[in-house]
Amino acid sequence: MKIDTRGYGETARAYAYRVIRENIISLDLEPGSPFNDMEFSRRIGISRTPVREAVIQLSEESRIIEVFPQKGMRIALIDVDLVEEARFLRLLLEKAVAELACDMAVPEDIEQLRENVKLQNFYMEEGSPKKLLELDNEMHRILFVLCRKELTYNMCRRLAIHYDRIRSLSVNTVKDRTIIE
């Protein structure tokens, strides 16, 4: 499991949420594996309450952690139906955002997108799948923000966690990758 440092001003709950979520997406916390909130809170150096709150939030918003009262918790298996729903949502929204972006983008936005694609190509050649996914997510965020749809982007990110695990799995296994500009 990878543990990032806590951000300045980041609440304990937000920190726990971010670290758990990132480790689930990267598959460092494997689908079907048990999750021990007491051990996790010890490892990241915060009390158990914010960890439990983060687990409840993840369980409710994306069904990514299964909570069994009096028994324990486990990382949910990848739900194919939720993957398909997230794919469908992205297909519809990203098409609409791309059309809006064509009308709303200024030269600085286009340059920022070009720079992002260059970095994606660099990290693809370097064999850094985690960084590649981060940059891809950032490219989509840039598009949503320039269209003034950041709330929509954030909503999609919360719903797409099962889809993101499939993306993480595929980017780590596919050998011949190219980015089309």
Task: Kindly label every feature range from the protein language model.
Residues 87-95, 110-114, 177-181:
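Hydrophobic faces of stable alpha-helices that mediate helix-helix packing
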Residues 78-84, 101-106, 123-128, 168-176:
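A ubiquitous short alpha-helical element
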Residues 107-168, 180-181:
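Conserved amphipathic alpha-helical segments that form helical-bundle/coiled-coil interaction surfaces
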Residues 5, 57, 168-181:
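C-terminal-biased regions
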Residues 1-99, 103:
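Short linear motifs at protein or domain termini
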Residues 60-66, 157-161, 177:
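Mobile beta-alpha loop/short-helix "lid" or hinge segments that flank ligand
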Residues 93-96, 102-104, 161, 172-174, ...:
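Short, surface-exposed, polar/charged, turn-prone segments marking secondary-structure boundaries
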